[in-house]
Amino acid sequence: MSQSDXRSGXKAREEALEQWVEERKKKRIAEKELRRINKKIKKLEDENPWLGNVVGMLRKKKDEEGGPPAKRARREDMEIDSTPGRKSKARGFTDQERRDHRRRKALENKKKQLAGGGKNLSXEEEEELRRLARDDDERERRVAGPRPGGVNPMXGPPRGAPGGGFVPSLQGVPESPFSRTGEGIDIRGTQQFP
């Protein structure tokens, strides 16, 4: 390798180094500028909470363009045996009522979460929540599930297997065995088993 080759090699290296230093300097300045802009945006969003809704709408639009597919609604058509022992459907809720109730609860949760960040539901969601709440309040009060009364109701024949079945009935038995009179569990052996 001659002297001139070594000189041109060193010159090329110097130029590359200068360019590298220059570009890194530009990068540092750009990053500093970006941090300043982000700070300014955050300050604007903090001072004007309504901007959060705009950001949400922009994100939503971006997701619609090429985001993941939306969640499919849960399907409610599970097969049910129609045995004679099933409780009548009059006590239960219709599928539409269940869907409405679930949607109302979801909207209420969303409202709470947004309120934590100083944001609000969109006008359509707010209107839908009001409508669902009104429908829920106007609906006739019912309770899902079995009839009240427990395993051994006070009145009527005991439910379950003959001879006690689930547990001996302890209704009407005072807590202390020493103050107790009347029926209940035989602890002294003077009565028969209830």
Curated annotation (Swiss-Prot):
Keywords: Acetylation, Host nucleus, Host-virus interaction, Methylation, Phosphoprotein, RNA-binding, Viral penetration into host nucleus, Virion, Virus entry into host cell. Phosphorylated at serines and threonines by host MAPK1/3, PKR, and CK2. Acetylation modulates nuclear localization. Neo-synthesized genomic RNA migrates from the nucleus to the cytoplasm, where they interact with S-HDAg, which once acetylated redirect both partners to the nucleus. The keyword Disulfide bond does not apply. GO terms for biological process: symbiont entry into host cell; viral penetration into host nucleus. The modification Omega-N-methylated arginine is found at residue 13. Its main location: virion. InterPro entries: Delta_antigen_N, HDAG_dom, HDV_ag. Residues 20-194 form the HDAg domain. Residues 45-194 are annotated as: Disordered. Residues 129-194 are annotated as: RNAPII-binding. Residues 128-143 have a biased composition (Basic and acidic residues). Pfam families: HDV_ag (PF01517). The modification Phosphoserine is found at residues 2, 122, 176. Residues 12-59 are annotated as: Dimerization. The modification N6-acetyllysine is found at residue 71. It is found in: Virion; Host nucleus. It comes from the Viruses. A motif (Nuclear localization signal) lies at residues 65-74. Residues 96-106, 135-145 are annotated as: RNA-binding. Belongs to the hepatitis delta antigen family. Promotes both transcription and replication of genomic RNA. Following virus entry into host cell, provides nuclear import of HDV RNPs thanks to its nuclear localization signal. May interact with host RNA polymerase II thereby changing its template requirement from DNA to RNA. RNA pol II complex would then acts as an RNA-directed RNA polymerase, and transcribe and replicate HDV genome. Homodimer. Homooctamer. Interacts with host RNA polymerase II complex, and with host NPM1. This strain belongs to the genotype III found only among cases in South America and which causes a more severe form of infection than genotypes I and II. This is Small delta antigen. It comes from Hepatitis delta virus genotype III (isolate VnzD8349).
